């Protein structure tokens, strides 16, 4: 029997190894297309590649699960076979430069087959199973100092592995040098640049290409990102970023994933950690496109926090959600969302529709405004680590998917996201200047979302949040829809020009906000009526209207619809407009 189990285990391990190698080969093929898409300015193709790569892993795992079931037959639930399969898989995967990613793939297969609740270290790879760090070859190329910063940057740009011609490389090097020299002069130590160390592969995402690295000045390291754009007249250096905050936003949790050719993901994460020491490993892996391994790393970070601390899960700050029970650990900037069994009025959505919207966000361009949500199934946590009030809420409101027994809380399905400050609380608690900036960025967030065909549906401030960098993001997806699926209408009697007074809906609009004396379809949206839902009053209301009043007109939304339907892909940069070189130095 032992020999038979061993043979079955080796067969299962081989099937999973073959599945993983097929996945990695196809993933590498899709990722390698990013350079050609950028050089050809094929932005629609880049979007298709992004969706194809996002869908790839689940398809390969599903196929591999079928092959493993066929291989194991009646022994498919035999945990001794799976324990030995893990050992056999580890023996062949340990020497791989991407061993940690391979381990997460193995875990996905085992959890899909066995529906494990919690984590079973006998048949799953944990952080403790990772092989000892090897001496990886350098992930960067060093460019020693030149006579001038301009000459150094010109050499870097000429060496970039991009075949498309630059519009004006000398100009870009000169403008970037002005920015970089001014930054270095402003540092307390004023130590000159010794070298620039750039990651060997180019990081591609959307319409951008990024040279990512660091500036070495003696013992000091400063992050550096050179953001490239490809316009009608050629490639141009669009921005140079050299603060941890700016580079962190480029790698933010509201961005879509990079397409970057990597053989050694762990080594690249280690390199990026020198630029962004506050970024968790889970976020870096996710940003590099290894979202499933990033999800596994996040779970390990939560487990480590629970093991080392004594804080308890408590309800998250903010208004109580009608669709989700939301909770957090005070000492960890992560929130957890569990879908309620029933939704209180006026919510009319279903559990399946909510999950479909989260899936849509996962596959969509998040434009720096939609929080990346990691989806988990069959997790278990110690019941003693839940506050009594939260435990009671989970029992009574989420009982269909939550079971409390044996000292554990088993949760069938949840989402985990980075914790942010709800916008309604932020503007209430911040000083006036900071609140004004948040309201201005709230309008920018609505514009960015619209440009990527996203309409939040529910525009209450409580559904938006503010990151530690002060950026406004959207995190409540239960009413999210496509802009192109909406019918943006003007209120009857709004006046000439599609209600272009900017913010109709008052007495002059001919409608007092009660039951409308005209037909309203399920997809109809009246932008003139959105202002009361925003909950802005006084000076903050005035600030929003002055900067973003056109968002309250049907004309603006119909114009963006027309652009989207025509196939336009709008530029959205992971940096401020004033940071673009030609704006900083016209």
Curated annotation (Swiss-Prot):
Broad class of the protein's primary localization: cytoplasm
Catalytic reaction list: L-seryl-[isocitrate dehydrogenase] + ATP = O-phospho-L-seryl-[isocitrate dehydrogenase] + ADP + H(+)
Annotated compartments: Cytoplasm
GO terms, biological process: glucose metabolic process; glyoxylate cycle; tricarboxylic acid cycle
Binding site for ATP: 316-322, 337
EC number from the UniProt entry: 2.7.11.5, 3.1.3.-
GO molecular function: [isocitrate dehydrogenase (NADP+)] kinase activity; AMP binding; ATP binding; phosphoprotein phosphatase activity; protein serine/threonine kinase activity
Active site: 372
InterPro entries, alphabetized: AceK_kinase (IPR046855), AceK_regulatory (IPR046854), Isocitrate_DH_AceK (IPR010452)
Record's keyword terms, sorted: ATP-binding, Cytoplasm, Glyoxylate bypass, Hydrolase, Kinase, Nucleotide-binding, Protein phosphatase, Serine/threonine-protein kinase, Transferase, Tricarboxylic acid cycle
Gene Ontology cellular-component terms listed: cytoplasm
Family: Belongs to the AceK family.
Role summary: Bifunctional enzyme which can phosphorylate or dephosphorylate isocitrate dehydrogenase (IDH) on a specific serine residue. This is a regulatory mechanism which enables bacteria to bypass the Krebs cycle via the glyoxylate shunt in response to the source of carbon. When bacteria are grown on glucose, IDH is fully active and unphosphorylated, but when grown on acetate or ethanol, the activity of IDH declines drastically concomitant with its phosphorylation.
Record protein name field: Isocitrate dehydrogenase kinase/phosphatase
The species this protein was found in: Anaeromyxobacter dehalogenans (strain 2CP-C)
Gene expressing this chain: aceK
């Amino acid at each position: 029997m032992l020999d038979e189990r061993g043979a079955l285990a080796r067969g299962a391990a081989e099937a999973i190894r073959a599945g993983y190698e097929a996945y990695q080969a196809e993933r590498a093929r899709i990722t390698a297309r990013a350079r050609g898409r950028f050089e050809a300015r094929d932005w629609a193709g880049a979007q298709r590649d992004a969706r194809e790569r996002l869908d790839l892993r689940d398809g390969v795992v599903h196929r591999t699960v079928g092959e493993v079931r066929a291989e194991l037959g009646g022994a498919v639930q035999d945990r001794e076979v799976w324990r030995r399969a893990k050992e056999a898989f580890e023996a062949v995967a340990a020497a791989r430069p991407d061993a940690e990613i391979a381990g997460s793939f193995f875990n996905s297969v085992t959890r899909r087959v066995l529906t494990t609740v919690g984590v079973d270290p006998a048949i799953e790879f944990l952080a403790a199973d990772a092989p000892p760090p090897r001496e990886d070859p350098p992930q960067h190329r060093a460019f020693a100092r030149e006579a001038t910063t301009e000459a150094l940057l010109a050499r870097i740009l000429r060496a970039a592995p991009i075949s498309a011609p630059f519009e004006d490389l000398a100009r870009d090097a000169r403008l970037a040098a002005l920015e970089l020299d001014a930054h270095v002069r402003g540092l307390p130590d004023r130590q000159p640049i010794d070298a620039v160390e750039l990651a060997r592969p180019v990081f591609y995402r959307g319409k951008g290409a990024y040279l990512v690295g660091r500036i070495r000045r003696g013992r000091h390291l400063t992050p550096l990102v050179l953001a490239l754009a490809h316009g009608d007249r050629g490639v141009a250096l669009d921005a140079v970023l050299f603060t941890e905050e700016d580079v962190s936003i480029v790698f933010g949790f509201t961005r879509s994933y990079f397409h970057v050719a990597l053989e050694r993901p762990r080594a690249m994460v280690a390199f990026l950690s020198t630029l962004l020491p506050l970024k968790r490993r889970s976020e870096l892996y996710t940003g590099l496109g290894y979202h499933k391994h990033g999800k596994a790393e996040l779970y390990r970070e939560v487990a480590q926090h629970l093991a080392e601390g004594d804080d308890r899960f408590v309800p998250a700050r903010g208004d109580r959600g009608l669709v989700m029970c939301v909770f957090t650990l005070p000492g960890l900037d992560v929130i957890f969302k569990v879908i309620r069994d029933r939704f209180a009025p006026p919510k009319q959505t279903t559990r399946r529709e909510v999950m479909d919207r989260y899936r849509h966000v996962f596959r969509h361009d998040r434009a720096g405004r939609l929080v990346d949500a990691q989806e988990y199934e069959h997790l278990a946590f110690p019941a003693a680590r839940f506050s009594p009030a939260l435990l009671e809420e989970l029992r009574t409101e989420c009982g269909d998917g939550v079971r409390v027994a044996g000292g554990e809380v088993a949760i069938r399905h949840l989402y985990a996201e980075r914790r942010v400050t709800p916008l309604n609380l932020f503007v209430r608690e911040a000083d006036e200047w900071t609140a004004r900036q948040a309201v201005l960025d709230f309008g920018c967030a609505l514009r960015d979302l619209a440009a990527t065909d996203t309409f939040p549906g529910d525009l209450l401030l409580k559904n938006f949040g503010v990151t530690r960098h002060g950026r406004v993001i959207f995190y409540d997806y239960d009413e999210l829809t496509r802009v192109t699926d909406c019918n943006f209408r003007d209120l009857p009697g709004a006046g000439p020009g599609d209600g272009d007074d900017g913010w109709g809906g008052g007495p002059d609009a001919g409608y007092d906000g009660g039951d409308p004396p005209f037909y309203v379809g399920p997809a109809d949206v009246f932008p003139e009526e959105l202002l009361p839902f925003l909950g802005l009053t006084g000076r903050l209301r005035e600030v929003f209207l002055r900067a973003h009043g056109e968002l309250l007109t049907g004309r603006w939304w119909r114009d963006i619809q027309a652009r989207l339907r025509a196939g336009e892909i709008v530029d959205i940069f992971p940096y401020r407009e004033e940071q673009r070189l030609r704006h900083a130095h016209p």
